[in-house]
Design a protein with these regions (language model features):
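Glycine/proline-enriched, intrinsically flexible loops and inter-domain linkers
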Residues: 1-354
Length: 354
């Protein structure tokens, strides 16, 4: 908003008055650098000689080597999703798992229920770390001004994780970003959060650093075809249905493996472009093919940088008839849709790896 008096919404089922403000935030991240708080992520710490063995058991994905990060689904015994997590390895006996803050208690109970056969110490450290993410083509330039470590692309690669001082503050830095841009998640103790914010804002002045919010973040992930936990990824769905099976390591044993291997659902997470001018999906809208319902919306909105209305849907692929258009019903009206074949923004992923 331009000022405090301007910071309000007006109830509407169409695009709200904040639409243009969110667009400005997205464009600044894509072209310069932005900053957003990430204190909401959960942080689960595992230490001990069996730390890797334990995580290999509960995680379906391949675990990272020391200094690296991997993305991994976590499955239930029924082969359904119970987590979409980021795993950081500090050394062979120490890991930090980052996940949804909303699901942290569910994940805590799940981890604790499987600890008894392993020599591993587990602690939920979510309240001990807050954090800020910086993202955009100038984010490295900002970081370089307030660290002593070499954070060049050669020395601090995409999906690296390190402990270092940032603006004099001890931090954990993960080189990842939910925006699809070059970016860093910087985690610090809560009492350092304001200091970190001030250091980043001061260092980023010459690069036009500006805060951005959750709506901008969710818009940017739509442009990358990335689902979100509680919306597109949830315990109702399998890894195969959501496309998260691409992260599964089938060469090891893990909870839910046999169920996941035998799963044969024809329902798939399918991103769509929606042909609409002033209204977007939220969730649970019907997806139609002719006069037949073939699925439903799990999330969506406006992808500001590519200027498209996007819907993430679960569609039964066996019900699609090619002679009929795919449409979504929004507020009683049907809107034509087309399937998104590849990410609308930076499909090769070069920007976040640069």
């Amino acid at each position: 908003a331009n000022n405090k008096e301007d910071a309000h919404e007006e109830p509407t089922i169409k695009r709200s008055r904040s639409h243009d403000y969110v667009s400005r935030e997205v464009i600044n991240v894509r072209e310069n650098v932005g900053l957003i708080e990430v204190a909401n992520f959960s942080k689960h710490e595992f230490k001990g000689t069996d730390a890797r063995k334990f995580l290999d058991h509960v995680m379906a994905g391949k675990l990272p080597k020391p200094g690296r990060i991997s993305l991994s689904p976590m499955l239930s015994y029924r082969g359904k999703l119970c987590g979409d997590l980021t795993v950081a390895c500090f050394d062979e006996n120490e890991f930090m798992v980052f996940g949804s803050g909303a699901a942290q208690e569910m994940h805590r109970r799940w981890f604790e229920s499987h600890l008894d056969k392993f020599d591993v110490n587990y602690k939920n450290r979510s309240d001990e770390f807050h954090g800020i993410s910086i993202a955009g083509p100038n984010s490295r330039k900002v970081l370089e001004k307030i660290v002593r470590d070499d954070v060049s692309n050669e020395k601090f690669k995409f999906r690296d994780s390190r402990r270092m001082f940032v603006g004099g503050v001890p931090a954990i830095i993960n080189r990842i970003s939910f925006t699809g841009e070059l970016g860093y998640e910087i985690y610090v103790a809560p009492h350092y959060q304001i200091k970190l914010y001030e250091e980043l804002m001061e260092a980023g002045k010459e690069f036009n650093i500006k805060p951005f919010g959750g709506r901008a973040l969710m818009s940017m992930r739509l442009e990358k075809n990335w689902g979100a936990w509680t919306l597109d990824y949830r315990p109702d769905f399998t890894a195969k249905e959501t496309g998260l099976d691409m992260f599964i390591n089938w060469d090891k044993d893990f909870i839910g493996k046999e169920k996941a291997k035998s799963e044969n659902s024809s329902s798939k997470l399918t991103p769509l472009i929606v042909e609409t001018n002033d209204i977007d999906v939220t969730n649970n809208e019907a997806v139609m093919n002719g006069d037949q319902s073939i699925g439903y919306v799990t999330s969506g909105g406006f992808a500001h940088f590519v200027n498209k209305s996007v819907a993430f849907t679960f569609i039964d692929q066996n019900k699609i008839k090619s002679e009929n258009k795919i449409q979504i019903e929004i507020n009683g009206d049907l809107f034509n849709c087309s399937v998104i074949k590849e990410p609308l923004y930076d499909p090769s992923g070069q920007k976040m790896r640069s």
